[in-house]
Amino acid sequence: MTRQKTYILTAISAGLFLVLCWAFADGLFALDSLWHSDAIAESTIWTYVLLALIVVAGLYQARRLPESGIAIHPSNEAAMVTPGQVDDPVWWKLLLGNVYFSLLWLPLRFFVGREWLAAGEHKVRDSAWGTGESLAGYWTGAVAVPEGGRPAITYGWYRDLLQYMLDHKWYTWFADVIAWGEVLVGIGLLVGALVGIAAFFGTVMNFSFQLAGSASSNPVLFGLSVFLILAWKVAGFWGLDRYLLPLLGTPWHRGTIFEGGTPPTTPVVGGNLRTN
């Protein structure tokens, strides 16, 4: 990895963020909507702040590299010694497992995280949602089967599940679970805290909304979140995961908080970062 390549990665990341904001959201660049006190997460100032963070992260990474660059060679030892093991392409291993390519995950994190935070903020501020009235209305419309028409819900078992939740008034408390769940997923992705887990619960909500017949932005967020889940080891490196993952570890690699050790200087989960 060289400084020039890092500059290219930074440009690609910034461009991808702009494309996502342009293609899958409306009005995120409007200068007359820079700040909304009643919808803070939707304020367009965050578009420019997040874009600036991507650029700053890229420039910082480039300046930290030696002028000669760093040789990156993903290991393929497992495929060579394990019978039946199929090795992944080098570019895929680098993208999902090398922190020097984590810049490319910033636009996905920022876009998906902001969408979740904005959706959650709207629900938290809505008194009708807080009482469960809005959710009850949504479920009622979803389970309805119009005469001669196509029901919103394709699968009968899911319609029965929502009907059960309606009959037992789950909406009185489940509305808060959804609202604050969206807020937490959004914050987790934006600050890079347990990105894989946050993205996973985001896909659970996307999947549930789609099963209930609501398309909206759910297919887009679901697809982008799947990639964040796959890249969980490095997607949050420019964020709190840089420190959280080595501390907490995984079921197959104990974190330093449980071993009483000192985190490595530039850590990744599952082992130390090789810089040569």
Regions found by a protein language model. Give the residues of each.
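Extended, low-polarity transmembrane helix blocks
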Residues: 1-181, 191-276
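Transmembrane-helix motifs of polytopic, lipid-linked glycan transferases
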Residues: 184-188
